[in-house]
Amino acid sequence: ESCTGGLIAATVTDIAGSSAWFDRGFIVYTPESKMELLGVQPETLNRCGVVSEPVAREMAVGALAHSNATIAVAVTGVAGPAGGTEKTPVGTVCFGFAVKTPQAVCAESSEQHFVGNRCQVREEAVKFSLKTLIALLS
C-alpha cells in the first residue's frame, strides 16, 4: 500500500479471524521503499512514474514474492489535496492485483479516478481493492 497507508490491511484485519487468511501488509510510501521492499524496478519508476499501472503490477508481484500469500493487491496514487499533475491529477489511483498459481504468477492492473477529499479518495481506493479481490476469488 502506498497512498492508502495501511488502510486496506487495517480494514481486513478488523474482521475477527482474519489471521487465518491475512499474511502481511507492506506500507511503501516512497519510491525507495517500493524498490527495497517489493522489488519495483528503478527503470519502471523512471519510465512510467510512481503512480502508474506498471508500478502497481510490480508492487503486487513483489508482495507475493516476499510473503506466503497467494493473492496480493497493491495501491499507488495521489490522494491529495496536493501532489497531482496534469498526467496524474488528484484522485488518480493505480491498482495491481497478482495471483500465484502452481504454474505462474498472473498480474493485472487498473487505473481509477476518484472524486473527493483525501480521506474519501483513500476510502474509495480501499473499497475498489476489496471488491476486486472478492471478484478475483469468486
Regions found by a protein language model. Give the residues of each.
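Short alpha-helical segments enriched in small residues
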Residues: 2-138
